[in-house]
C-alpha cells in the first residue's frame, strides 16, 4: 500500500515475463485485461489491453500498439508502452482487481478495497533470486 504496510503481493518476475491485471470496468460493467511485462532493468511496460467494448477511459492511443479483434474482444496488442512504477487504487469487491501470474489469481479487491497500491519492480541478484526460490516471500502466491 502507498500509505505503508506489508506488500499485498510480491511476484518474482524474470525479464520479459508477464503478469495481468484483470478487473470489471466500474462504468461499463465489462471485463478488462491489462497485460504488463518487466524488462531487465526493472521497468514495467504495458503490452496489451483487452476488453469487450471501448468504454470510459479505454481506447487506442495513436502510435501505440495495434488494434485487432480476438474473438469477442477488442485487443490493443504490441503496445510495449513504459508505465514504470505506477499506483492503482484498488476497486470494490465486484470490480475485483485481480493479478494473474503463472496460473495464480490474487484478488486485490478482496484484500484491500479502496486502497492505493504501488506496482514497482527492482532488479535482484541471482543469489537473491535463488534464495527466494527456496524461501519465497510470504506475499508470493503458491504455484
Give the label of every model feature segment.
Residues 1-53, 57:
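N-terminal secretory signal peptides
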Residues 44, 58-143:
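Mature, soluble, non-transmembrane domains
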